[in-house]
Amino acid sequence: MDIAGKRFRKEEKLSSQKTINSLFENGNIFYSGILKVIWKTNNDSVSAAKAAFSAPKKMFKLAITRNLIKRRMREAYRNNKHILYNYISEKNVSVYLFFILTSKNMPDYKTTEKSITEAFNKLISLI
């Protein structure tokens, strides 16, 4: 994947409150390492996958810490999304993803990246 393909574009961000609520009500859940992943397939999306990331305030009181965690999750997603996108383009489906950190400790980037890639592999087996 070239450098242009490794961007996390606006079209890939899950930002619609209606869609997020639908995802939490009707989505499927699985755990991957330090992440809880809520996902749902969709047929009428512009992008192959849309993703959102969350770090709970209950576990990480400081906003700077939560922002750092979300930044690491987005970076790991951006660098490894080709794993998921290759499969999705073959199957001609789109998917909504919501990643929530479940660890009580501050994860490093390698742990986050490992959990994201495990989540992609698990998701591929579930679709």
Regions found by a protein language model. Give the residues of each.
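Positively charged, solvent-exposed patches that mediate nucleic-acid binding
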Residues: M1-I127
